[in-house]
Regions:
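Structural/interface elements that position substrates and couple domains in central-metabolism enzymes
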Residues: 2-435
Length: 435
């Protein structure tokens, strides 16, 4: 039944959530058999029905390749699915506590409509134990069915990396787990139809959940170390980029870089792990310290910008600063939890006028989410300083002459990701600071 050539027609898969994680699942399974993409956002559904990815990660040609894909905002379609994959956001609230409301809401909707014998697979990032402690009871309550008798549950943490065309759903090993050995094999075979390198089987759902949160916690902590080193080197008067390049010549030096840590994964997932630890009476110190450092980098960069402007002789109050980039990372349109906003707000607290250019993201979304009006490159003023906040490819392609047209002579250039030629900028009379 799992054979891609013999039995695909017997399957109907449904994916709940048509974001960065869910839509690629619909597309890949939709190339082989009926795959239903469900989302409560009618706008997302309408965009997908027209053959356009709302997040602009997938090209229209890729969308069209999924000849068996369907899209709906009617939850009744979930009753037709043999497999239901859950790919909804799992954010944190303002106090950095896990917000499971999207996941609970999705589980309620699924429970009300799923058929007997269905396998529900969660992909959303959660703390170890959340699927069995929070989601399964909701499925039982809403459906009136019994777990492991009438329906089964698996877990396979998403590994989608927005803006990354190298590491995709189909070429990255998928971690899988199931509530029974039979479910595990069923889930493994299901994903093996689309994931070329295959799957890694975990012995429990909890182990698979833990796997995901530590992947991002490890990265968060490594970046936090680089950020702390950058702060120290700045005080010493050293260029962090040069020091890291030198250290990188050793075979076992891990090549992480300092920078802003935002988005819906790296800056969020550690809080899910620390929440679980707190529930068990253990209060993590290293993980929280890393989060504190990374969350403070926007303020630090803004402060350095002001110091560099003063060193240039600029009068700070009423000064103009151009910020290049607003998304949480390079080469993607995702504005969620962007730490560039920390820089912008801190600069504005000095009565600095901030202008933002972001070529990848939606201007309407930036205005709605943050109250920020995005400007085309041509409309940016000649400012007292430029903050190159996000390393988009389009910014890397800019010539020194392009940059100097948008900054006063003798102004300050703040290169957060060290992506531009500092020597050439200095030769053009620009003061350069980089993280």
């Amino acid at each position: 039944m799992m054979d891609a050539e013999k039995g695909d027609a017997m399957h109907t898969a449904a994916v709940v959530g048509l974001g960065y994680v869910g839509l690629p699942l619909v597309i890949e399974f939709g190339k082989r058999f009926r795959a239903i993409g469900f989302d409560i956002s009618e706008d997302k559904v309408a965009s997908c029905q027209k053959g356009t990815d709302p997040s602009h990660e997938l090209a229209d040609e890729e969308m069209r390749a999924a000849v068996h894909a369907e899209y709906s905002s009617d939850p009744a379609v979930l009753a037709e699915a043999d497999f239901i994959l859950v790919a909804v956001p799992t954010p944190v609230d303002e106090a950095h506590r896990p917000d499971l409301s999207p996941l609970i809401g999705a589980s309620q909707t699924i429970g009300r409509h799923m058929k007997k014998g269905v396998t529900v697979v969660y992909e959303s990032t959660v703390y170890p134990g959340a699927t069995e402690e929070e989601c399964i009871p909701v499925l039982e309550r809403e459906s009136g069915m019994r777990w492991k008798r009438d329906f089964f549950v698996g877990y396979s943490p998403e590994r989608i990396n927005p803006g990354d065309r190298e590491h995709m759903l189909t070429n990255v090993i998928k971690v899988v787990a199931g509530d029974t050995p039979a479910t595990l094999e069923k889930v493994a075979a299901f994903y093996e139809m689309v994931v070329q390198p295959g799957v890694f089987r975990c012995s429990s759902i909890k182990a698979a959940e833990a796997c995901k949160v530590i992947e991002n916690t490890q990265r968060d902590l490594n970046i936090a170390l680089m950020n702390e080193l950058a702060i120290i080197f700045d005080k010493i008067g050293l260029d962090t980029t040069e020091v890291l390049k030198a250290a990188g010549t050793k075979w076992n030096f891990l090549k992480f870089k300092p920078g802003l840590v935002g988005g819906h994964c790296i800056g969020v997932d550690p809080y899910y792990l620390t929440h679980k630890a707190d529930m068990l009476g253990y209060h993590p110190q290293v993980i929280i310290a890393g989060r504190r450092i990374n969350d403070g980098m926007g303020k630090f960069i803004a402060e350095q910008t002001v110091k560099q402007m003063i060193a240039c002789g600029s009068y700070v109050k009423g000064a103009k600063v151009n910020v290049l980039g607003l998304t949480f990372k390079e080469n993607c349109a995702d504005l969620r939890n962007s730490k560039v906003m920390d820089i912008i707000r801190e600069l504005q607290s000095y009565s600095i006028e901030v202008f933002v250019h972001e070529p990848e993201a939606s201007a309407a979304e930036a205005l709605h989410e943050y109250g920020v009006r995005l400007l085309p490159w041509e409309e940016l003023p000649r400012a007292d300083a430029i903050v190159a906040a996000v390393a988009h490819r389009r910014f890397l392609d800019l010539e020194i002459e392009d940059l100097t047209k948008k900054i006063v002579k003798g102004g300050a250039f703040i290169d957060v990701k060290a992506m531009h030629d500092a020597s050439a900028l200095r030769a053009a009379g620009i003061r350069v600071w980089r993280l």
